Amino acid sequence: MKATKTTYKKDPMGLTPSQIVNELNRFIVGQEKAKKAVAIALRNRCRRKRVEGNLRNEIVPKNILMIGSTGVGKTEIARRLAKLTNSPFYKIEATKFTEVGYVGRDVESIIRDLVEIAVNTEKTLAKTKVDIHAREKAIERILDSLVGKTSSSETREKFKEKILNGELDDKEIEISVADTTPVGGGSFEIPGMPGASMGVLNLGDMIGRALGSSKTKTKKMLVKDAMAIIIPEESEKLIDQEKIIQQAINLAENDGIVFIDEIDKIASTGSSGAKNAAISREGVQRDLLPLIEGTTVNTKYGPVKTDHILFIASGAFHIAKPSDLLPELQGRLPIRVELNSLTKDDMIKILLEPETSLIKQYSALIGTEDVRLEFAASAIEKIADYAITVNLEVEDIGARRLHTILENLLEDISFEASEMKGKKITIDDKFVENQLSKIITNLDLAKFVL
């Protein structure tokens, strides 16, 4: 059944689990068990916030381990969940990390990056609230440059109206703006600090704070360009930076979602090659343990507790098994969800049902050239059939196979669309067969093309 956007009755605790699943159904086909698991995890966060007393701090999120091959919806479920709740969301591959003491990224950088995302989110929200005031101040600064600070109110009002109407957009003015040139070099990490605990330090930031951040320079630019630069400057002055940082840390601690992909790649197996590599992978797992269980990570914004951050780990587990992870790490990912491989029916639904389905995307793209692109039901079935065939014969990459097939299928149309204005193109099963049958039947070629 096709999911549609629904207006829900206001709930003081936010969306209910069934409502969350309905929202995910708008974009993701199947995988009901995984959707149900993340919906419960999200609702439990809301429930925890309403628990009173010391018990609230004892209730920790039940972290999730998603098991399934690539392209079945693991990442998309987590990404849509974060977007649905406006939570800080950070996705990272487990293979990017090395254990503490080795060259490479340490796992604490996950929390530093999550907090950075939360700060940017809060800052953007705060700027929207002061946008009107900031715009007024920007106009006043431009008026000072245009007519001088001592000009009459009547003159200023006249020129202000012209600025608002866009009549002076292309007029060049000379105006003082903040000097954003980096001071004193770039960023570095302090060696010898446990896990580089303060994160990346920027010399420019440090020197700027020491000398004061009021350094400006005079530049010549058009009025419209000046507005684009000055409005953010004025917004920065109007917002309370300390308050934003406090809110961002609170948001990251209580609503943050961390998605760790390819966790199966750091699992140690008996046949996993060099002993040192296995030790290194195990080291990364051990470094992840305190982070997932709950610890305090020092960031440039202050200490951040990870006790109530929701961790979702995922992996295909083709070679390694979940039981190959360290027992302690398995215990910190108590909810296990297996995602099913996609069937032909799933592929058909993926092409048609989501609000942002691939068919709708390609039709919209070609439609910008005044060309109407339509897909017959027989074509959709044929595309799904080919996607399943190649996944079985070459390698199973799930729904991502549809992207490759559609690109090859519509290559000529995409190339020639600008010369086909006003035309209607119908894609049927014969068209699909003519375009793709040679590639599909030649598996050696399909490995490279599809």
Swiss-Prot record:
Q: Which Pfam families does the entry link to?
A: AAA_2, MCM
| Binding site residues for ATP | 29, 71-76, 261, 328, 400
MF terms from GO for this chain are: ATP binding; ATP hydrolysis activity; DNA binding; peptidase activity; proteasome-activating activity
Question: Where in or outside the cell is it found?
Answer: Cytoplasm
Q: Gene Ontology cellular component?
A: HslUV protease complex
Q: Which CDD domains match?
A: RecA-like_HslU
Broad class of the protein's primary localization: cytoplasm
Keywords attached to this Swiss-Prot or TrEMBL record, sorted alphabetically, are: ATP-binding, Chaperone, Cytoplasm, Nucleotide-binding, Stress response
Q: Name one GO biological process term.
A: protein unfolding
The protein's matches in InterPro entries, at most eight in alphabetical order, are given as: AAA+_ATPase, ATP-dep_Clp_protease_ClpX, ATPase_AAA_core, Clp_ATPase_C, HslU, MCM_dom, P-loop_NTPase
Residues in a coiled coil are: none
Q: Which family does it belong to?
A: Belongs to the ClpX chaperone family. HslU subfamily.
Q: Which HAMAP family match?
A: HslU
Q: What is the purpose of this protein? A: ATPase subunit of a proteasome-like degradation complex; this subunit has chaperone activity. The binding of ATP and its subsequent hydrolysis by HslU are essential for unfolding of protein substrates subsequently hydrolyzed by HslV. HslU recognizes the N-terminal part of its protein substrates and unfolds these before they are guided to HslV for hydrolysis.
Q: How does it assemble?
A: A double ring-shaped homohexamer of HslV is capped on each side by a ring-shaped HslU homohexamer. The assembly of the HslU/HslV complex is dependent on binding of ATP.
Q: What is this protein called?
A: ATP-dependent protease ATPase subunit HslU
